[in-house]
Regions:
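Accessory RNA 3′-end/elbow-binding domains used by RNA modification enzymes
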Residues: 1-12, 17-38, 42-45, 98, ...
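Conserved glycine(s) of the Walker
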Residues: 171
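Catalytic cores of RNA-modifying enzymes
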Residues: 1-167, 177-206
């Protein structure tokens, strides 16, 4: 079984679930999960976790993301992108590049974004897009998100090409809609390309066809990033056999329990570390609590089927 993360390039026309289903067929492995959905009409970086790395999905979903998007001004749709039904059309003749730039840049920083009806968020156990398809609209709570940076790549009205770096939970479709509303002419998203999720960029992403070929040649695992390599900034902690056995059961441990080779480091409060046994088998991610002088479990990656 493969354990690790693969940087997949999701092509247009596929849902993120479609990508996972196709990968299961390619590698003949069920335990696969993606780390944050992309709309079917969007494309770009989609990190996919295999085997024990599926425990990473929530950790990767929390990471900042970067997108390139094309904003179409003068048009409002029910889906907030050009795939939806047009609800309004307005002239953009009075817009100037300067006004557009100023309004777009005003969205940098934190703002309360209302999720779109056409989204996978659930209300009372039902997905919003299912309600939307039934012609229903329900009240959605605004969510505080952060737009770290917006770069305006090109203005060719009524279209504007943007690069957006943002926090988790940000809907670029909704950002486009909100920019249009603030400009007074409406707007929607025409194109979306996700260019980065944390360490994963377009430059090393792999399309499904290439993945199938690599698997056929028996070299796909060369492209898989090992679980512990996903945390390159975390210090490594090596444990002697007795402590390692306890840690495999999720027990906490103290600094004095660490093998000599990694015991000399001073650990900050709440610092996360990668925990290994003396054969350098990766076990878990732990966090140091200075008050108790204890390392406490964050995420376990060892399972009982592995050799100890």
């Amino acid at each position: 079984m493969i354990h690790g993360v693969l940087n997949v390039y999701k092509e247009k026309g596929y849902t993120s679930h479609d990508v996972v289903a196709k990968l299961r067929g390619i590698v003949k492995q069920k335990k696969i999960g993606h780390t944050g959905p992309l709309d079917p009409d969007a494309e770009g970086v989609l990190p996919v976790s295999f085997g024990k790395a599926t425990k990473l999905c929530d950790l990767l979903t929390d990471k900042d993301k970067t997108y390139q998007a094309v904003l179409l001004l003068g048009q409002v749709t029910d889906t907030q992108d050009t795939s939806g039904q047009v609800l309004e059309k307005h002239s953009t003749e009075d817009l100037t590049n300067e006004k557009v730039e100023n309004v777009i840049r005003s969205f940098e920083g934190e703002y309360d974004q209302i999720p779109p009806m056409y989204s996978a968020l659930k209300v009372n156990g039902k997905k919003l897009y299912e309600l939307a398809r039934e012609g229903k609209e329900v009240e959605r709570k605004a969510r505080r998100i952060t737009i770290h940076e917006i770069r305006i790549l090109e203005i060719n009205l009524p279209e504007v090409k943007l690069e957006v770096t943002c926090s988790k939970g940000t809907y670029i479709r909704t950002l486009c809609h909100d920019i249009g509303q603030k400009l007074g002419c409406g707007g929607c998203m025409k194109e979306l390309l996700r260019t980065r999720v944390e360490r994963f960029g377009l430059e090393d992403s792999i399309r499904l066809g290439e993945i199938a070929q690599l698997q056929k040649e028996g070299i796909l695992e060369e492209k898989i990033i090992a679980i512990d390599e996903m945390f390159p900034t975390y210090a490594q902690v090596v444990l002697p056999p007795k402590t390692a056995a306890a840690v495999r059961n999720g027990n906490s441990f103290r600094k004095r329990d660490i093998s000599q080779e990694t015991a000399l480091k001073e650990y900050e409060n709440d610092e996360r570390v990668r925990v290994y046994d003396e054969s350098h088998q990766f076990i878990a991610i732990y966090c140091y609590c200075r008050k108790d002088d204890l390392f406490k479990i964050v995420k376990m990656f060892f399972d009982g089927n592995e050799k100890k």
